[in-house]
Each structure stands twice: as structure tokens, then as C-alpha cells.
């Protein structure tokens, strides 16, 4: 039996904690024998003192084991169980295409996703723009959908890493959210509970990212890579750009529409295509579904071209209680905004830079996101037809189309977009979409 205060004292004084001490503390978080004050104290001690890689692995495994861990062995799946996780951003709709694409290539993707909070969008919120879509199927139904369709996207249940929920809630109010080892443990505690054969992490970099600077993002990427592989899950990490929205739209129903356009071939934003393909290739390679980049690329292009990826998305929607003809009748199912109108730059010129976080907060202000976890969402609002750095803007070419619930909210969003998009007279330097790959 380890006393929580002695564990806190040990870390406060800069000593390494044993696996048993870490597991004892996290078990106490789960069963409420450890108080909120004690969680806050340990989190702050970790923030100041950091923890070693073995401690990080032990913390992550304890978070994972605080609840149920999915096991797929009894289902006789004829392919690998793989997933992707992104640190989040604006217009990051990759999950909605990536899951069906990998499933169409023979993988199984049990994606447990989250809601949006702050300026970042949430995959669950996007899917709830689809009428009837059930993000909380029973465990048996979840397993059944994975077996039959190959892809299901669901929310975190109470049985999944429950200690992390309590630990994170305390971090959120004690200025310890930005602790890299605690971020890694929180992300991976949930992901490893999925029972994965392989994981691909997308760590965002830039003005719309969790960690704005490349240095911070690389530190987080290295932490996630070390912990996940140390915990026995084959993991690759990509660092990708979030200095502008990833898609051409930002907002729940708007991003669902763009995902369907991507899968059917109607429209594919080049940056979104590059990141989605790169993540999918890593999933195929990590899962043994392809032996080279070229083979993975060919398989992915084939399932886009022959409609298999779009079909997998349609089957997932139907299996999770959404409309069976959603793709064919998308206009009749997605909610329509009260007002859609373009916003223009105050001066003509060339888009130089974008404050991606500010664009995300403009969507939140429209009603498309949450400031607090209890807030409700207007799924119809957001931004579409977004410009990119290097685009010319004038009285003919708008910065974006704003979809709003009222003229007043449109006006507020228009000002926010005009302030967030900087216009100059020279072409900006081209920047990478994918900065770095970290793998074994």
C-alpha cells in the first residue's frame, strides 16, 4: 500500500516513481481514494520535474488498465486492427475519409474519438450532424460493426480509461494541461485501450495546433512515439502543418459534406489529400497491408477510384443508425444554415498568412463549437470555400463563405475572418504540409 502523499513527495523531490507506485496512484484516481487536490499536486510535480520514459510508459499503461481494454481475438478478423489519432486543429476531417479508406484496403479501424473543445473541431460533433448517427453503440454492437464493415467511429464510454477522465478534468483547472508527459499518457491511455496492432499519430504544428511551435510539437511527437512503442504498440508519428485550415471548410455539417465529396471524387483539397494519403499509407505499412509506399498508395487510390472507400463510409453510417442513402441524398439530410454569404478582404492582394486558431474560434462564435463541455452546437454553421496562403483576393474572390444563424452572427464572423487572414502584395514562401516522420 502506497500513500498518495508519499508518491507526491517523491516526485516533488525529483525522484523516479516505480511502476507499482504509479499504478497505485492511478487506481486511487479511479476509485476516488485519491483526492482532487492530490491529483493536482502530482500533476504539478510532474509539470515541474518531468518523468522518465519508463515512468511515462507505466503511467500510460495504468491509465489504459483503469478500465476495460478491447480484445479482438475472438472475432477472427482477417486483417490488422489499426487506428489514427490527431492532436487536432481546424478543418481536420481526415478521420472521416481515412477510416473507410483503410477498411476498404482490408484493415479494421475501431476509432474512439472525441468532441471539439476550444478552437478545434471534434469528429463526434461532425458525425452527429448526420441524422440518427449513433456514437454510443453497445460494446457488442461496436464489435459487430467492426467485424462487418471494418470501420466504426464512436465516443469514449465510461468503461474506457476512466482514470484519465478524472485526471484530465483536474489538469484542466490547475494549469497542467500543457504537460507533455501527461498529454501523451492521456492520448495513449485511451488509444491503447482499443487493442490495436498499430497506431499512426498526426501531431499538428502551427497557429491552429495544440503546440504552436515546431519545437514543442516535436517534443510531443517524440514523447508519444517513445511511450506508445514502449507500451508495445507499433507506432509511427507524422508532424503536419496547421498554419491554415486543413480542409476548404470548417464546421460540422460542412466538413461532413467535404468528406463525402472527397470520397466520391467530386472535390479533393490538395493539402487534405496529401495528409490523408500519408496517414493512410502509414496505417497500411504498419499493419502489414502493404510492403512499400508505392504499393500502399496504389491500393488507396484504387479504393477511391472504384468507390470502395465511399461504400465503406456509407455502410458505417447505416450500421450506426444513420440514413442508408446518406451519400446519395446528402442535401436532404444535412442541416442547412439560415444564411450563407461571402466575406471579402478589406484590400485586394495575396493571402500571406492565416491565424488558424482565430478562424476556429470564429466557427465557435457562430455556434459551431463549444466554449464549455456543456454547450450545445449548431451543426449547420461554419466557413466554406476558404482561401489559402498564396491565393489572390479582391472584390471577386472572397476570403470565405460564412454560414450563420443570423445576420448579427454573420457580421461578427466576417470581422473575425478579415482579421484572421492577412493580405499582402507578395507571394508567401511555400511551406511543407508534412514536416517530419518519426518511425522505428
Curated annotation (Swiss-Prot):
One of its GO terms (cellular component) is cytosol. Pathway: Pyrimidine metabolism; dTMP biosynthesis via salvage pathway; dTMP from thymine: step 1/2. The keyword Glycosyltransferase applies. Keywords: Glycosyltransferase, Transferase. It is an enzyme of class 2 (transferase). GO terms for biological process: pyrimidine nucleobase metabolic process; thymidine metabolic process. It comes from the Bacteria. SUPFAM superfamilies: Nucleoside phosphorylase/phosphoribosyltransferase catalytic domain (SSF52418), Nucleoside phosphorylase/phosphoribosyltransferase N-terminal domain (SSF47648), Pyrimidine nucleoside phosphorylase C-terminal domain (SSF54680). One of its GO terms (molecular function) is 1,4-alpha-oligoglucan phosphorylase activity. Homodimer. Belongs to the thymidine/pyrimidine-nucleoside phosphorylase family. The enzymes which catalyze the reversible phosphorolysis of pyrimidine nucleosides are involved in the degradation of these compounds and in their utilization as carbon and energy sources, or in the rescue of pyrimidine bases for nucleotide synthesis. This is Thymidine phosphorylase. It comes from Erwinia tasmaniensis (strain DSM 17950 / CFBP 7177 / CIP 109463 / NCPPB 4357 / Et1/99). The lineage of its organism: Bacteria, Pseudomonadati, Pseudomonadota, Gammaproteobacteria, Enterobacterales. The gene is deoA.
Amino acid at each position: 500500500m502506497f500513500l498518495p502523499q508519499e508518491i507526491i513527495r517523491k516526485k516533488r523531490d525529483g525522484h523516479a516513481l516505480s511502476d507499482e507506485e504509479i499504478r497505485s496512484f492511478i487506481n486511487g484516481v479511479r476509485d476516488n481514494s485519491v483526492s482532487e487536490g492530490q491529483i493536482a499536486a502530482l500533476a504539478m510535480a510532474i509539470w515541474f520535474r518531468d518523468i522518465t520514459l519508463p515512468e511515462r510508459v507505466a503511467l500510460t499503461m495504468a491509465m489504459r488498465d483503469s478500465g476495460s481494454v478491447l480484445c479482438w481475438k475472438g472475432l477472427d478478423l482477417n486483417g490488422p486492427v489499426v487506428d489514427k489519432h490527431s492532436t487536432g486543429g481546424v478543418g481536420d476531417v481526415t478521420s472521416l475519409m481515412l477510416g473507410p479508406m483503410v477498411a476498404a484496403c482490408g484493415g479494421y479501424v475501431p476509432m474512439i474519438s472525441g468532441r471539439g473543445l476550444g478552437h478545434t473541431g471534434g469528429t463526434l460533433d461532425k458525425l452527429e450532424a448526420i441524422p440518427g448517427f449513433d456514437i454510443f453503440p453497445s460494446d457488442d454492437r461496436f464489435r459487430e460493426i467492426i467485424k462487418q464493415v471494418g470501420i466504426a467511429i464512436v465516443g469514449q464510454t465510461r468503461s474506457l480509461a476512466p482514470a484519465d477522465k478524472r485526471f484530465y478534468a483536474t489538469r484542466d483547472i490547475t494549469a497542467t494541461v500543457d504537460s507533455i508527459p501527461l498529454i501523451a499518457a492521456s492520448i495513449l491511455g485511451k488509444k491503447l485501450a482499443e487493442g490495436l496492432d498499430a497506431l499512426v499519430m498526426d501531431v499538428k504544428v502551427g497557429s491552429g495546433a495544440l503546440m504552436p511551435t515546431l519545437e514543442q510539437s516535436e517534443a510531443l511527437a517524440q514523447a508519444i512515439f517513445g511511450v506508445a512503442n514502449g507500451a508495445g504498440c507499433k507506432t509511427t508519428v507524422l508532424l503536419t502543418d496547421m498554419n491554415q485550415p486543413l480542409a476548404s471548410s470548417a464546421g460540422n455539417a460542412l466538413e461532413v459534406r467535404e468528406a463525402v465529396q472527397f470520397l466520391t471524387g467530386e472535390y479533393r483539397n490538395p493539402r487534405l489529400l496529401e495528409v490523408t494519403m500519408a496517414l493512410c499509407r502509414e496505417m497500411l505499412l504498419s499493419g502489414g497491408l502493404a510492403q512499400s509506399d508505392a504499393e500502399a498508395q496504389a491500393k488507396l487510390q484504387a479504393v477511391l477510384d472504384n468507390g470502395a472507400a465511399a461504400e465503406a463510409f456509407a455502410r458505417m453510417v447505416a450500421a450506426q443508425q444513420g440514413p442508408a442513402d446518406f451519400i446519395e441524398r446528402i442535401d436532404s439530410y444535412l442541416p442547412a444554415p439560415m444564411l450563407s454569404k461571402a466575406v471579402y478582404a478589406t484590400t485586394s492582394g495575396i493571402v500571406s498568412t492565416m491565424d488558424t486558431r482565430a478562424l476556429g474560434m470564429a466557427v465557435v462564435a457562430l455556434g459551431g463549437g463549444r466554449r464549455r463541455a456543456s454547450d450545445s452546437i449548431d451543426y449547420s454553421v461554419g466557413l466554406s470555400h476558404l482561401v489559402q496562403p498564396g491565393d489572390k483576393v479582391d472584390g471577386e474572390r472572397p476570403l470565405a463563405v460564412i454560414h450563420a444563424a443570423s445576420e448579427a452572427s454573420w457580421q461578427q464572423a466576417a470581422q473575425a475572418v478579415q482579421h484572421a487572414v492577412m493580405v499582402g502584395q507578395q507571394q508567401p514562401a511555400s511551406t511543407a504540409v508534412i514536416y517530419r516522420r518519426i518511425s522505428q
